Amino acid sequence: LDSGVLGRLCAPVVERELEIWVVGLLQRGRKVLIPEVCDYEIRRELIRNRSASIAQLDGLAKTFEYLPITTPAIRRASELWAILRQTGVPTAPDDSLDADCVLAGQALVAAEAENRSVVVATSNVGHLVRMVDARVWQEIA
């Protein structure tokens, strides 16, 4: 899950379509992962806004599998960050951490570790699709 989808799952009232979609994935035995970088992006805003949704985010981390940031993932993210700039299509300013690169690095390393394909569920494929298989969440079954 990218931060857009994860954030919507943390809303006080989760959209019914999104809830049905994620429950369906779990029922079909699909892994639903919360990348640590996305947890960070959502959690910092929830803390800043003093939101009660932090408990919901913590609950999701218990329901879904948590994907920690690892050294191989950060190294892959660094490669992606550099390649995007070398080819003239950066996804964030040069002084930015660029969470999309970190998320893509996490996804690629997870795919290699498990020897299976990984699809990032997002609400905006624009940046992510340059680095990893990313699809609008409604298109993932």
Over which residues does each language-model region extend?
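Histidine- and aromatic-rich ligand-binding microenvironments
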Residues: 1-2, 34-35, 96-97, 121-125, ...
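Short, well-structured N-terminal submotif of metal-dependent ribonuclease cores
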Residues: 1-34, 44-64, 116
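A generic structural signal for short hydrophobic patches within well-formed alpha-helices
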Residues: 6, 39-42, 74, 128
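Short aromatic-enriched loop/helix-cap "lid" or pocket-rim segments at secondary-structure transitions
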Residues: 12-13, 46-47, 80, 131-135
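Hydrophobic helix-cap positions at the C-terminus of alpha-helices
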Residues: 24-25, 60, 84, 110, ...
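Short, hinge-like loop/turn segments at secondary-structure boundaries
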Residues: 49-53, 84-85, 138-139
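Short, mixed-charge aromatic SLiMs
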Residues: 62-67, 128-135
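Active-site neighborhoods of divalent-metal-dependent phosphate/nucleic-acid chemistry enzymes
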Residues: 65-123
